[in-house]
């Protein structure tokens, strides 16, 4: 085992917005090579947690450590080399070429006043190929569909080569083939030692992760592997029994799926 600290650790993090406490003593450890899915009903605090983990919002209590140092003390450029964040809203409007958006992912490596290196450009082109957005590289964001914009923004994050990826609803606007491609990118990064956390509303996508963090009302309710019975029970409970979790066999491998439950007495 390596003696290095976990890439990202949140200890007893709380967050208040006005009079509302949106996070309450949350503890999260994101390990290298791990894909963590964060799930919970609307208003559970998932996106708020991600902004605190990214150092974009200071917690009211507790602390977040990035590579063993408080995330808030990292110079912005150095932090961006270590940690990349995809926001839920996407910030995907504007008269800027798609390829220039992806190039922003390399800005922390070469600075505002320096031209990108050959390695920077190679990372940009590789990320755009991976997310299948090379074909519209010169087009403006405001000319792209929602799914195309999302792929550009995901490419920006992947181009950063950061050791920690925080992705808030990365599957938004993506059709099934591009959701699959996104999941493949996440899994490949985790397999290469990157620490990845994704906020997901689709429970079936979350069930593909290494570990699932279940939130409700600003608290962590449970965390565990998808096959863990206690984790599955917590998932069903926080979503008011809207689904059951069933074991499937796909291509000879065990998989878990959330199957919606409908009230059989409801009128048709």
Spell out what each predicted region is.
Residues 238-268:
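ABC ATPase nucleotide-binding domains
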Residues 54:
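Helix-to-loop junction immediately C-terminal to a conserved catalytic motif
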Residues 62-70:
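Conserved ABC transporter NBD signature motif
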Residues 39-41:
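The feature captures the beta-strand-to-loop junction immediately N-terminal to the Walker
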Residues 165-169:
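Catalytic Walker B motif of ABC-type/P-loop ATPase nucleotide-binding domains
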Residues 103, 118-136:
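Conserved ABC ATPase "signature" region
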Residues 140-144, 148:
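Conserved ABC ATPase signature
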